[in-house]
Regions:
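An alpha-beta-alpha
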Residues: 114-117
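N-terminal nucleotide/polyanion-binding subdomain common to many enzyme families
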Residues: 2-99, 103-107
């Protein structure tokens, strides 16, 4: 079931796929969020950490079989649609979302200059 809505705690649109909230951030917005969080940790060492999951269809299926995994996915601060199966499922419900592969995020972050306070 997909419910597209503006999250109460987030400033972007989210959708729900089998009781897992998916963040409809594109690659650039996800990178900015990560960079901002890293910068916050530079200036405020006690700033909140950010748990990011890049979810694929296998993870969705596994979560239907494993309540502990489902709970972890539901508690993550950001869940991005990594796999094309997740993107397809969201689009079948009328939600247009960009695929955001985790490996692409890591590569992009590693190309950024390192700032040490």
């Amino acid at each position: 079931m997909i419910n597209t809505e503006q999250s109460h705690t987030k400033h972007w649109v989210t959708s729900s796929l089998l009781d897992i909230e998916i963040d409809c951030l594109g690659r650039q917005a996800a990178l900015k969020l990560i960079e901002d969080t890293l910068n916050d940790h530079q200036t405020q060492p006690r700033a909140q950490a950010l748990q990011i999951v890049t979810m694929n269809a296998e993870m969705v299926y596994a979560a239907t079989q494993d309540p502990a995994l489902l709970s972890l996915l539901q508690q993550a601060e950001v869940v991005l649609p990594d796999g094309i199966g997740v993107v397809w499922a969201l689009e079948r419900q009328g939600v247009s979302v960009e695929r955001v592969p985790g490996i692409d995020l890591v590569k992009a972050l590693l190309q950024k200059p390192l700032k040490i306070a």
